[in-house]
Amino acid sequence: MIFLQNIYIQGKKNEKTTWWQNFINFVQQKFNRIKMEKIGDNSYLYTVSHLDHKNTLKQLEKKIQKKQGKEVQVIFSKEAEFLKKQWKGKKINIETFKKISLPLLLDYLLEQIQEKPQTLLLQDIYFCAKTLNEENKQIIEYFLEKVKTVNIVTTELKSFQKLEEKCGKEKGIWITVSNNKRKSLNKATWIVNLDFSAQELETYQIHRQAVIINCTEEKMKKEKGFEGIMVQSFDVNGYSSICKMLEGAFTSITLMASQFPLTLDYEENVRKLKQMGVNIRNLIGINGKINQKELLNHKKFLTNKNI
């Protein structure tokens, strides 16, 4: 059987990559069976025009991984439906990508709900974090000079107080660390949940008009009387043409997350995201897409309260 099949490869570059690229180009020219096109940093699109029992996709995948490294991610296009299942098994960290998107997402929300143009530099951001892992540490340090104040709400006070002291001594910027369930979030208008569970977040008294961005994949619950905005996820524009082939099978955030490494270099990944020209298309709340009416109502509240 002859059919067109695309394979998208993303992974770390190693010493054998150049040799493998040359091999692909050679095959392309001599046999017109495999074509290679570079579509990003360490990202290549392989087009296989003829497959038989001696040249299966599984064998091709193993061969490419052997030459480029085991950490590559392989994404199959939707021309062959059964291949979607293989792609679904790949390790893609949606939560990490949500965190990488925070600067983009906060700028988008500011534009949508603030009556007058404002920047992150004027905002007080509250991060809910129970674990001081390398990922959360990099995020907090990134925002230190990007916002007015960084506030940490955590159950692990000792760990974060050490970070508080370090930031104060080394950068001259002091963060606030607290765990008062009644007071810590009751005046916060910008809340970013890094790793609290829905049950843990429910134990805190939250400003009824807060904007909450949830970076976990667990669905948050809307408490009675809450009139703010809960961003559970979002859709994006600006990803590669190969990802567009898979739009019908996967969410845009999943497709975009597949283009980022599982290991976190937060500042570098934020820079990469901006260079790709990614834009927020829709905000998704706990009950589906957040419409313009909800955003407009929130803008009116902020204007009337002068927040």
Predicted features along the sequence, with ranges:
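Adenosine-phosphate binding glycine-rich loop
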Residues: K16, V211-I307
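A short, well-structured beta->alpha microelement
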Residues: Q28-M36, L51-K58, E164-L185, F196-E202
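Short, charged/polar "capping" segments at the starts of alpha-helices
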Residues: A80-Q86, E134-N136, L157-E164, Q199-L201, ...
